[in-house]
UniProtKB/Swiss-Prot annotation:
Gene name for this UniProt entry: plsX
Function: Catalyzes the reversible formation of acyl-phosphate (acyl-PO(4)) from acyl-[acyl-carrier-protein] (acyl-ACP). This enzyme utilizes acyl-ACP as fatty acyl donor, but not acyl-CoA.
Domain of life: Bacteria
Classification via Pfam families: FA_synthesis (PF02504)
Entry keywords, A to Z: Cytoplasm, Lipid biosynthesis, Lipid metabolism, Phospholipid biosynthesis, Phospholipid metabolism, Transferase
Protein name in UniProt: Phosphate acyltransferase
Top-level taxonomy: Bacteria, Pseudomonadati, Pseudomonadota, Betaproteobacteria, Burkholderiales
């Protein structure tokens, strides 16, 4: 099965320098992939000219005259910039010309435009943002929602769990993923009313519901999936990113303190590199916008060429394994339970 990916080539902090270069790398590894690069043709061609091995027969350049900036209000991105690279890329999925779209652009705008153009799956009240967070087991804990829905009702959280359950099966190959509900304690008596009601509803489904989990369980890998509302999820995500940057800076500072500590760093380089690889956030790049009638992947705005490649990987696996169709089918089954 051939897979076509539409890329918002202008999105993110680095634009075409990252997106187009990463696309060329990806095409070299996947002979069954075609890519549509959406944006300024002149800028796109400049980068392509530096990649002589790029299989041009599998690359399509689509003109888009506008760009959604990272600080653009959602209203501007949605109503005024109707020829933005982000919007035109999403329209490729809507029209069936692409199987998935990837953008490093403004998250709020991406969700709003995707929801406006693609619409939500039947029965889905609200789309959610899901991504993997590094854990000590060496694989990611899938967490959602990460900011799309600050306030949620119990049934919204149940729907998030249902959609993530299929996504983890499709993208990560975990056939019966365990699901945890983020709470202030494992006991069923703890938490607010929304969490308590959600827990009860999840126990009534056919999902592999583990029960309540705490914040530290995310990084332990206690469950494959952790569900929470978007307010809590975004706080957890930003806090974990901040902690990782702080620890990295402190370690670098300590090893550069003196000649002796620099020598110690040389001696410890192998285990340090192993640890860095296991927690490298770039390897977990590519959040999925779940609940839409199309596959939409959000890459981190600051993603480099290496990180953007992982977002393309995620889009490829989701599209190849028909994630959206399988979520729609499984969702209907679960909602009948």
């Amino acid at each position: 099965m051939s897979v076509t990916l539409a890329i918002d080539a202008m999105g993110g902090d680095h634009g075409v320098v990252v997106t187009v270069s990463a696309a060329c790398d990806f095409l070299e590894k996947h002979a069954d992939v075609k890519i549509a690069l959406v944006g300024d043709p002149d800028l796109i061609k400049q980068v392509l000219s530096k990649s002589p091995k790029a299989p041009m027969e599998r690359i399509q350049i689509i003109l888009a005259s506008e760009v959604v900036l990272m600080d653009d209000p959602i209203e501007v991105a949605l109503r005024r910039k109707k020829d933005s690279s982000m919007r035109v890329a999403i329209e490729q999925v809507k029209e069936g010309a692409a199987d998935a779209v990837i953008s490093s652009g403004n998250t709020g705008a991406l969700m709003a435009i995707s929801r406006y153009i693609l619409k939500t799956l039947e029965g889905v009240d609200r789309p959610a943002i899901a991504t993997a967070i590094p854990n000590e087991l060496g694989r990611g804990t899938t967490m959602l929602d990460l900011g799309a829905n600050a306030d949620c009702e119990p049934m919204h959280l149940v729907q998030f769990a249902q959609m993530a359950n299929v996504m983890v099966q499709v993208v990560d190959g975990e056939q019966n993923p365990s699901i945890g509900l983020l709470n202030i304690g494992e006991e069923v008596i703890k938490g607010n009313e929304v969490v308590k009601q959600t827990s009860e509803l999840l126990r009534q489904t056919s999902l592999n519901f583990y029960g309540n989990v705490e914040g530290n369980d995310i990084f332990r890998g206690t469950t494959d999936i952790v569900v929470c509302d978007g307010f809590v999820g975004n706080v957890v995500l930003k806090a974990s990113e901040g902690l990782a940057k702080m620890m990295s800076g402190l370690i670098r500072e300590e090893f550069n303190r003196s000649l002796l500590t620099k020598l110690m760093a040389v001696c410890a380089i192998v285990p340090l590199l192993r640890v860095r690889k296991r927690v490298d956030h770039r390897r977990y790049n590519g959040a999925v916008l779940l609940g839409l009638r199309g596959c939409v992947i959000k890459s981190h705005g600051s993603a480099d060429r290496f990180a953007f490649g992982f977002a393309l990987d995620r889009a490829y696996e989701a599209a190849k394994n028909r994630m959206v169709e399988r979520i729609a089918a499984a969702f209907v089954v679960e909602t009948k339970v």
